[in-house]
Amino acid sequence: GYETLDEMFAVIAGILRSGAPRSYVYAYWPQLDSLAHEHGIHSDAVAEAFAALDAAFARLLDTAHGSDSLVIVTADHGFIDTTVEATIDLDDHPELRETLLLPLCGEPRMAYAYVRAGRERQFENTVRGRLADRVHLIRSEDVLRQGWLGPGTAHPALRDRLGDYVLIPRGQTIL
């Protein structure tokens, strides 16, 4: 295990230097995400944490050089600073809320809408008439067909999980 950034990279470097047989190493560093939530993505705290992470990662790549290792870095989500004013609250849009079978699902930056049978046109008209400047409205089948969630064949249950429509906020907006 590890508790500090340096310890995390030391553990990974130790595995790379050990000459052990092929293995999969997963490491997660939550500090950048935590600081972004607490201070905002443009804060000095986030910039300093990112610089430290970047420098430690560069040192790891130096260690990995020549080790026949594949290093992949990924993120589980992006960052956005937003405000209360940028939030679309369904309580402010009862004409939209009444078309929904369930509350919006998914996440604030990609909401899934389950629309009551027979209310699809009202839902579409309401979103286009009142929120078009703040959200993209996409039919769920188009999200899948256009590959928004990745290539390949979608799991059979995915279509049901997306609801009928996907709402993707523009700019700093969240739902």
PLM segments and residue spans:
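Feature captures the catalytic ectodomains and active-site-proximal regions of enzymes
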Residues: 1-175
